[in-house]
Amino acid sequence: LHGVAMILFAADNHYGTHAGQNLFECLRPHHEIHFREDDWRCLVEENLAVTYDLLMFHLIGGTCDVPAPGPVAEQQVKKYLQAGKPMFLLHGSSAAFWQCAWWRSIVGFRWVRKDDPDGFTPSSHPIRPYLVEVAKSRHPLCQHLQDVAQPADEIYINLEQSCPATTLMTTTTEEGTFPMAYETITPWGGKIVSYLPGHAPTAVRHPGNVANCRSIIEYLITPT
């Protein structure tokens, strides 16, 4: 019998918004989540792939006056992914290990910071209310996602696509149509789902936003 899925959720304070913490508070009644903020010791554990069924991030490496996760954390996360395990990346987490070339190449669409090691122009985030819509796609997860009318919040646009990805949700703004949720398969066969909405507390706690995150978690922890 498959026991309760164990989830490790590592977040930074995200510029004082505590976005990861806010999402954790909404998810904790439904899932078994080991949450840590601004503390990467949880990532240096041996055998993350044995202990956890899912790794979640809401962090951008080296921001918020918190040192980036170090080389040991990086290696343990890589070992977890090399075991074919799934990962859920929230908001800017495609840049969790942005200094590492191997990481940048596997996350699908990635948030590009200034002084990008690969030389791409930075991504941007206009702030205004926006509608996140389920993509026109036969991906099974799309049947379990819902459109969300977000309050004024950061809209992540102009990300760089570093590998093939299936778009699950989009938004259309005056700048164009951009992916807001997407899946990519790692070189080791594991699933990575990214969900970009969720900076301000009101956006993170939006019931539609929480429901989408719950659906993504269920998808990622369900054995195929």
Segments from the language model and where they lie:
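Aromatic-Pro/Gly-enriched surface loop or interdomain linker
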Residues: 1-54
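Short hydrophobic segments within beta-strands
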Residues: 9-12, 90, 195
